Amino acid sequence: MELENFMANTLLLKARQGFTKKTGRSKKWRELLKLPPVSMCSDLRHSIEKDFSSLCDQQPIGRLLFRQFCNTKPDLKRCIEFLDAAAEYEVTIEEEQREFGLSIYSRFFKENSEVSLPQIPPDLVKECKCNLKQSSPSQNVFQDCAGVIYKYLSEKPFEEYQESTYYNRFLQWKWLERRPVTKNTFRQYRVLGKGGFGEVCACQVRATGKMYACKKLEKKRIKKRKGEAMALNEKRILEKLHSRFVVSLAYTYETKDALCLVLTIMNGGDLKYHIYNLGNPGFEEQRAVFYAAELCCGLEDLQRERIVYRDLKPENILLDDHGHIRISDLGLALEIPEGEMVRGRVGTVGYMAPEIISHEKYTFSPDWWGLGCLIYEMIAGHSPFRKYKEKVNREEMERRVKTETEEYSERFSENAKSICSMLLTKDPSKRLGCQSDGASAVKQHPIFKDINFSRLEANMLDPPFCPDPEAIYCKDILDIGQFSVVKGVNLDTNDEIFYTQFATGCVTIPWQNEMIESGCFKDLNEYEDKGLSPLEKHKICSCILRPKRNFFHRLFRRAACLNIAHSEEREPTEH
């Protein structure tokens, strides 16, 4: 039995290492990712929505190809360079921000500058200059100027891009992205844990070597427990949410027996394991504060999409290879329509907010209560209303949550006591984070005085703990246990509608990121372009039939405002 666990762990570790070395790719990876002839993309060209923000900013491959197109034209290249500089200014540390801002002004706005930006009105340039004269200029000095450039790029340059070979290449990748996904897309590895409807296994994309976690929802178990709405809700929320602080959904597919969610793999284990299994229970305050800051960012991203999570607990907070955390398991999450409140008695005993226990209506207040519980537990080494290893039944736990006040040991600093007590306020109307300023108020608490949230959100801060890359932070295979066979449930054609809604293949942004991070995007583009002259590339471009643009299209063409965030893509080197 120990041999079985050893072999499973060895295979998983080898697979994890393969992604960075490119050895995880199938020998047939070029065949698996073969780009179609441009002529096959005509229907896609006509049907795809010409939305500048989506095609040239939000979609990673689209962003890279649009930037490559801009780099061929000096005036557009200057625009991209300015956007990058403005984005870098926003995440520059406060002590260096003014000096860096002045260098941007000197480079792009002075009359004798070689890279001036005539698109920006003089009054905005003057306003930037005035702001930069202050000893501590605003973080948003260049925001309005960037907005002007975004709008400029979304108009004629965007039209020219759509006539270029770069846009053709984008369509080829979009065609590839829309191919069906099956179990044969992946290699399967050991079981990592259990979910409500089935196992969670490690898996690897054959074409790229990228590792993921595959959450399998058994079809018969879903039907028996009437979990169709819950499963589809989790899938749809994950599909629309793109946050570095919440696990990402990359693929959905189905097998004969299961529906599968392919998610970010978090090799560092969960917070519960780290709180209780590595030394004495609990963390030093610095480590707890870092995780709390990332959780605050994750909750802010969820609330921006009107989503309440409702199940914050250590088991659901996972660490990645570098020690950053992500919120996982969105089975109880719910999207709340604007201006409405919801009622629902869901969550985990000991972490449910008083308003949930009392069947009251709420919006996002339960999640700020949950954050208070987590900060307390990370520091104290036990939850706020239950001592370490104490057994308490549901009724007693709910009584404590509603009536008792948590106690603080000497492990809590004054700031730690303050934020916990403010988040664990029984009355949600008085709880930190539950007023109009929401997450901003939580971020401004003194406990986060050493956290630069702009840099944290840009992934520029180092975590206080880095997991061992040679360790497997999960239970042994035999300790995880197996699900019993579901009996007395038959699947029929009526279930197929639900399966079709669920199993929709690749999710755009994570899939495109995978292609870039794996090096496949770079390698395939170089392979496809090998030996082609610029004239030949132009001929490939012009062979596509383009729809005629009528008067109304020209009159009402979309001029969406782009929200480009500077991101430096690092690609693996060739071996």
Swiss-Prot record:
Specifically phosphorylates the activated forms of G protein-coupled receptors. Plays an important role in the regulation of renal sodium handling and blood pressure. This is G protein-coupled receptor kinase 4. ATP binds at residues 192-200, 215. SUPFAM superfamilies: Protein kinase-like (PK-like) (SSF56112), Regulator of G-protein signaling, RGS (SSF48097). The lineage of its organism: Eukaryota, Metazoa, Chordata, Craniata, Vertebrata. It is found in: Cytoplasm; Cytoplasm, Cell cortex. Residues 186-448 form the Protein kinase domain. It is an enzyme of class 2 (transferase). Gene3D superfamilies: Phosphorylase Kinase, domain 1, Regulator of G-protein Signalling 4, domain 2, Transferase(Phosphotransferase) domain 1. It holds the Pfam family RGS. One of its GO terms (cellular component) is dendrite. Isoform GRK4A is expressed in testis. Isoform GRK4B is heterogeneously distributed in the kidney, with 20-fold enrichment in the outer medulla. Has a widespread but low level of expression in tissues other than testis. PROSITE patterns: AGC_KINASE_CTER, PROTEIN_KINASE_ATP, PROTEIN_KINASE_DOM, PROTEIN_KINASE_ST, RGS. It comes from Rattus norvegicus. Residues 51-171 form the RGS domain.
